[in-house]
A protein has these predicted regions:
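RNase H-like DDE/DDD metal-dependent nuclease/strand-transfer catalytic core used by mobile genetic elements
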Residues: 1-120
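C-terminal domain-tail junction helix/linker
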Residues: 69, 92-173
Length: 173
């Protein structure tokens, strides 16, 4: 990605789904709170949130958000990324498979490709933690969804037309 660009990633540690991957030139605590509110509107509140100590995650906006929502927030110890190993592994995979491989011509293109990669990760890619099922399918089956429902996306995709550069396994472009 271009210098000065960042990606906010929100993961469900239980289902292994990537709930959001928001790219922008900067991300404030208020933006993080808005993203979390949107996720909670779709999925319900988590028991707690675990994050690193980034400035956007330790901001007054996030402190106010946790007070307003009552959701516990746990910060990993500084310099101890292994305390959030799944997230670190996911971010490394996103970086290796997409961010370091593409030359994005615009923020819009970056957003589309990241969303397409996220959909592939959630809906197509097998995960050993779920016996080879993709995270979305595993979540739907665990929730008792009918098998036919597990084949479709859990939420409408945000990206409309992925670039021909990134071709994930199994998702039509």
């Amino acid at each position: 990605m271009a210098a000065g660009s960042v990606v906010l990633v929100v993961l469900d540690d239980c289902t292994r789904e990537c709930l959001a991957a928001a790219a922008d030139t900067s991300i404030s605590g208020a933006r993080v709170a808005r993203e979390l509110d949107a996720i909670i509107a779709r999925r319900g509140p988590p028991a707690r949130i675990v994050s690193d100590n980034g400035t956007e995650l330790t901001s007054r906006a996030i402190l106010g958000w946790t007070n307003r929502t009552g959701i516990a927030w746990h910060y990993i110890a500084p310099g101890k990324p292994q305390q959030n190993a799944f997230a670190e592994s996911f971010i490394g995979r996103l970086r290796d498979e997409l961010l370091n491989e593409e030359v994005f011509t615009s923020l819009g293109q970056a957003r589309r490709l990241i969303e397409h990669w996220r959909q592939d990760y959630n809906q197509v890619r097998p995960h050993s933690a779920h016996g080879g099922l993709p995270p979305t399918k595993a979540r739907l089956l665990a929730a008792g969804a009918r098998p036919g429902l597990a084949d479709g996306p859990a939420e409408p995709p945000l990206a409309t037309s992925p670039s021909p550069c990134y071709q994930p396994n199994g998702l039509p472009s």
